Amino acid sequence: MLLLRWFTSCCLWVFGLGQLEQTELSVTRETDENVQISCIVYLPYFSNTAIHWYRQKTNQQFEYLIYVATNYNQRPLGGKHKKIEASKDFKSSTSTLEINYLKKEDEATYYCAVWMRWSSGFHKVFAEGTKLIVI
């Protein structure tokens, strides 16, 4: 199974497809609940890759939120309440963004991203995004 996943990752990487996947197009949560948004990373070097998280509110620019390089290198935002956290699961090649104590102003589309090396240099590659709706 690991060999198949590695082979698929390499093929997708070679053709420039599917490096990142956010499987949920949208999620809906109530105010004061928590949400987890996942990003599957199809890269053979996941353990050495920093995963960056952004959000874009309606009619606004992208906002950089947080990154995670290793599972022990989380950078929580929001002080003691840990409003936003990011983590990595090496077994599933997945990064998870957790947003706690949701408020209406958290409503946005959330994106994971990684830096990829191409012949022309480094470029940031984004997943499709997951829209968070807070009711």
Curated annotation (Swiss-Prot):
Organism: Mus musculus
Chain segments annotated as coiled-coil in the UniProt record: none
Annotated region (J segment), positions in chain: 117-135
GO biological process terms on file: adaptive immune response
Name the record gives this protein: T-cell receptor gamma chain V region V108A
GO cellular component: external side of plasma membrane; T cell receptor complex
Keyword field contains Signal: yes
Entry-linked CDD domains: IgV_TCR_gamma
Keywords: Adaptive immunity, Immunity, Immunoglobulin domain, Receptor, Signal, T cell receptor
Keyword Signal attributed: yes
Endpoints of the signal sequence: 1-18
Other known facts: This mRNA was isolated from a cytotoxic T-lymphocyte. The gene corresponding to this mRNA is rearranged specifically in T-cells and its organization is similar to an Ig gene, with V (or V+D), J, and C regions.
V segment: annotated span: 19-116
Pfam family, one: V-set
